[in-house]
């Protein structure tokens, strides 16, 4: 075979050379000078964030990111990758496992979970595991089994299991420290069960809501694209805009079917005919102004009026108080 030189630094692949024993077949394999291609010089190992950027530049056809490196990434690399994922134009999620015991210390702010929380990243999550450096990958494995085109298929990450990951036995103060830092953990309870808690991103957003709304964003984009792609043309008229509104609403209806969205009260600022405090009986509402109100530049650019949708997330129950009144 070829001689490989180097190690962590740049390597190169050159011509085959005899080992000094056995039969030299390098000539038969055309691996010798004058026949084989010129030696190929390698490159030094790239930084983690640069590798992610290269993948992103190559393809948009991926969503979850986890480093299965033989050694744990340095905190600086984790922060660089998290920053890239947070600011990228394509929605993705990055997971990281920490084994640093400082994550269990309520007084520490130097651990990676604390640093990511301070930065307020909603597209990165951290899990503490003392035994498994790849524990957070199990959260990806569970979450990405969801088929959003089904009925009642969405789930919350809390209360789930992590096959192959040993549960942690924590003190009350250690559990409180992880929760305060928005650091997930697979933990053993004294009722002989083990669960993932709390199922959150670094900024405290729930994993399932970020995952679910990312799916919805992609699903609506795909549906609107297909409507434009398959029609001979959609006219730049109010009936034409209604075609797009119907397309959007069909995907919002699927979000109700799979359990991401549900009827409820809209508690944010209103738009169109929707006011704050109104009930969304379907769980969603979509609105687009008349094309008559468009700026001439937008009309000449063949843009549709902006379509706005309001959705009420179904959420999930994680805690419950039960009051029992007793009468003798």
Model-derived regions: residue spans:
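Helix N-cap and loop-to-helix transition residues
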Residues: 47, 74, 171, 237-240, ...
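Generic structural signal for short, flexible, solvent-exposed coil/loop and linker residues
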Residues: 4, 18-20, 44, 51-54, ...
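Extended basic-aromatic, gly/pro-enriched interface segments that bind polyanionic ligands
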Residues: 57, 114-244
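Polar low-complexity, Ser/Thr/Gly/Ala/Asp/Asn-rich disordered segments used for subunit assembly
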Residues: 1-134, 266, 270-272, 278-284, ...
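Structured, hydrophobic secondary-structure cores that serve as assembly/anchoring elements
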Residues: 196-328
């Amino acid at each position: 075979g070829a001689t490989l030189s180097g190690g962590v630094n740049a390597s190169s692949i050159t011509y085959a050379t005899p080992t000094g024993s056995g039969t030299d077949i390098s000539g038969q394999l055309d691996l010798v000078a004058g026949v084989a291609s010129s030696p190929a010089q390698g490159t030094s190992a790239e930084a983690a964030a640069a590798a992610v950027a290269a993948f992103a530049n190559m393809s948009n056809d991926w969503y979850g990111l986890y480093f299965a490196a033989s050694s744990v990434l340095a905190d600086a690399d984790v922060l660089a990758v998290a920053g890239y994922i947070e600011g990228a134009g394509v929605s993705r999620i990055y997971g990281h496992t920490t084994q640093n015991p400082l994550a269990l210390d309520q007084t520490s702010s130097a651990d990676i979970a604390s640093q990511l929380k301070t930065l307020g990243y909603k597209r990165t999550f951290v899990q503490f595991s003392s035994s498994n450096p790849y524990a957070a990958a199990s959260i990806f494995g569970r979450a990405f089994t969801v088929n959003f085109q089904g009925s009642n298929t969405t789930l919350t990450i809390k209360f789930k299991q992590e096959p192959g990951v040993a549960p942690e036995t924590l003190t009350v103060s250690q559990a409180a420290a992880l929760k305060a830092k928005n650091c997930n953990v697979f933990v053993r309870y004294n009722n002989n069960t083990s669960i993932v808690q709390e199922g959150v991103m670094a900024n405290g957003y729930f994993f399932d809501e970020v995952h679910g709304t990312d799916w919805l964003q992609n699903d609506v984009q795909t549906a609107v694209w297909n409507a434009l792609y398959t029609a001979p043309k959609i006219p730049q008229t109010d009936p034409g805009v209604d075609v797009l509104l119907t397309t959007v609403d069909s995907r919002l209806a699927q979000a109700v079917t799979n359990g991401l969205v549900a009827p409820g009260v809209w508690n944010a600022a209103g738009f169109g005919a929707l006011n704050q405090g109104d009930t969304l009986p379907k769980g969603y509402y979509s609105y687009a102004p008349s094309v008559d109100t468009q700026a001439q530049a937008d009309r000449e650019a063949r843009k549709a009026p902006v379509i706005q949708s309001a959705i009420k997330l179904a959420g999930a129950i994680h805690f419950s108080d039960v009051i029992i009144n007793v009468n003798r």
